[in-house]
Amino acid sequence: MTKHQNLPVPRSAALLLAALLLCTACGKREWPTPVASEDKFRWRSVEVQRNQGCVILNCELSGNWQNLDTVNVLLEPVGTAPGDGCASCPFTPRSTLIFAPGAAGLRKDMNRVAVTACELDPQKTYRVQVVGFSVFPGISPVASELMLSAPK
């Protein structure tokens, strides 16, 4: 005759709970990912002004504007000099100015951003585009419309 030993109910419940916790701990883990539809922003408006050798961009954002991190200003001089582009050619930026948070030429106030890009030729016309990067690397950069900035 064999003797069966019955486990007490609390002990078997504890074993079952331990097995359940052990199995759930083996799952795939990853960092939370941003939801693009909720975390994106866009340029609502971008106004361009010129002051001597500077381009001043007054921008307004919509959407989740708090996620704006870095702003790049893409510039292409338009003219007849070597290396200049033309107004009807495809946009080919010749220089990119990067404004990280806290940079000297970048000012943020709620959903408004002011960028001042200097050291430009005050006699030249420039094609300008603003590109905003999110704090979440998984979200694509957001580019503004292409604008033309003529000297005063």
Regions found by a protein language model. Name each.
Residues 28-40:
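Proline/serine/threonine-rich low-complexity linkers at boundaries of modular beta-sandwich domains
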Residues 70-121:
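Recognizes extended acidic, P/S/T-rich segments that occur
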Residues 2-14:
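Bacterial N-terminal signal peptides that target proteins for export
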Residues 135-152:
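Extracellular fibronectin type III
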Residues 22-25:
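C-terminal motif of bacterial Sec signal peptides marking the signal peptidase cleavage site
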Residues 53-57:
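Structural beta-strand segments of beta-rich domains
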Residues 117-139:
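Beta-strand-rich modules
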Residues 61-66, 134:
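Extracellular acidic, Ser/Thr/Pro-rich low-complexity tracts
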